[in-house]
Amino acid sequence: MTTSSSSPLSYKDAGVDIDAGDALVERIKPLAKKTMREGVLAGIGGFGALFEVPKRYKEPVLVSGTDGVGTKLRLAFEWNMHDTVGIDLVAMSVNDVLVQGAEPLFFLDYFACGKLDVDTAAAVVGGIAKGCELSGCALIGGETAEMPGMYPEGEYDLAGFAVGAVEKSKILTGKEVQPGDVVLGLASSGVHSNGFSLVRKCIERAGADRPATLDGKPFKQALMEPTRLYVKNVLAALAAHPIKALAHITGGGLLENIPRVLPEGTAAHLKKGSWPQTELFAWLQKTAGIDDFEMNRTFNNGIGMVVVVDAANAQATAKTLRDAGEQVYEIGVIAPRGEGAAVIVG
């Protein structure tokens, strides 16, 4: 036979602090306000956010993307570095939307935890707002889920959702890519948000022998450097040049992501050494003891976005991107595929 206490139980007693949630919303509102842009009719606070597609689009096609930050979050927990993973969250989705030729319009986030720490959550959302601001998209809504017993104390998970628009006639499909086209690579800012399960093993293996700095940055900062946001610079290049295809280099690296935008019967031949390997990736490769093939299939290995253009437009496109602030390398050409792999590095 069981007995129950006569004391009343509140939602807070059960582990859900509504007041903390309300306090977080008040912290978020001014951050979200800074991201507002044309098209926002109603943002944070309502049951649903409202967005009107800008009238300058004649035949708008909506493009959606969703992603997370993966096990990079484990380092954020261990090192108490929460202010940049929100940028990662935005970048993973808006860069994906971008490769269709689309302009990101708005973003929503999902933050889940076992016990809500308002300061930690506000730091994360501050990063999300910064990522949206840098991408020109509005943070118009989100969900904060406090779920006692679902996550260890001090841990959380993130998911992001982006929607963009592109003129129907300007959707990038890669179907016009052909042999002779040039492959440009835009430098990454670091590991970005993929491969961190292996990164964490490398940190564990290195122990106290890990370097103090990598590429001029403190070790932890180098690894937590947020995913580069390519949106504004690449949109400017798209407006000025006939770009044929874009590929966001995420999980699977160069070897798995470039083929996603290549027509059947074509392959990308990348020239080894045509872009520099940073200290960060050299350290990861040496510590893990893996070959070049595995590096290019696990990490972005220094190239975060690939741009495919006609050879006649390659120099002008590269100049536009460089002038905007990108590090651009001519890393290869498109060739007939034959019997080989879709991406060959050699």
Curated annotation (Swiss-Prot):
Main location: cytoplasm
Residues annotated as signal peptide: none
Gene Ontology CC terms, in alphabetical order: cytosol
Entry GO MF terms: ATP binding; phosphoribosylamine-glycine ligase activity; phosphoribosylformylglycinamidine cyclo-ligase activity
UniProt cross-references to InterPro entries, sorted A to Z: PurM-like_C_dom, PurM-like_C_sf, PurM-like_N, PurM-like_N_sf, PurM_cligase
Subcellular localization, as worded in the UniProt entry: Cytoplasm
Top-level lineage group: Bacteria
Keyword Ligase: yes
Metabolic or biological pathway, per its Swiss-Prot or TrEMBL entry: Purine metabolism; IMP biosynthesis via de novo pathway; 5-amino-1-(5-phospho-D-ribosyl)imidazole from N(2)-formyl-N(1)-(5-phospho-D-ribosyl)glycinamide: step 2/2
Keyword Metal-binding: no
SUPFAM superfamilies: PurM C-terminal domain-like, PurM N-terminal domain-like
HAMAP family found in the cross-reference section: AIRS (MF_00741)
Protein name: Phosphoribosylformylglycinamidine cyclo-ligase
Organism: Polaromonas sp. (strain JS666 / ATCC BAA-500)
